[in-house]
Amino acid sequence: MLPGLAQLENTPEILRLLLDGLSGEEANWKPAPDRWSIAEVIEHLSHVEGHGFRSRMDQMVESTLPEMLEYDQEAFAAKGQYSGRDIEDSFDHWEDQRDANIQFLRGLDEAAVIARQGKHERLGIITVGDLLNEWAFHDMGHIRQILELLRSHRYYPNMGRFQSIYRPAP
């Protein structure tokens, strides 16, 4: 099995569980003006799924040592790419892309593609294996981010004296 594929397959269910019962206020709450809301995290996942991960994967599988631009999430965020979108629409779009990407990845011959390379503009030479591991790592980072936003906003304010023993960092 390709590295990271099991995590990529599991992420939709994990996110579905985290988003179940989420109010609009919770979805759009930001701990600070320069931090992302849960809705923005989901829109980022939707955008990077196709414009980052799948695009790079296609380039490396189809071409010999393609040159790949950096995906600058902070620049996209500053331009409002992740803001003002409906979280359900963003999730549905992401999930459709993820389903297609899983089918694509399952169809690859691991031995034939795992060491294929691309030239990232900042990182230099990367392999399909590197990208797959980063993709799973990226999923897990945003799962952690959503968990921290939820616990900081939904539960921490209502913990009374227990707040003194925790320092949430959303």
Regions found by a protein language model. Give the residues of each.
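Short, contiguous alpha-helical
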Residues: 28-73, 117-170
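Surface-exposed helix-capping loop/turn segments at secondary-structure junctions
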Residues: 21-27, 106-114, 151-156
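Solvent-exposed alpha-helix faces
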Residues: 13, 20, 46-47, 99, ...
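Short acidic/polar alpha-helix capping motifs at helix-coil junctions
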Residues: 4-7, 18-22, 64-67, 79-83, ...
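Alpha-helical bundle segments that constitute or directly flank the non-heme di-iron/ferroxidase center
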Residues: 1-26, 48-59
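Acidic/histidine-rich alpha-helical segments that form the ligand environment
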Residues: 7, 11, 75-115, 130-135, ...
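Solvent-exposed interaction patches of small proteins and small membrane subunits
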Residues: 3-6, 30, 62, 85, ...
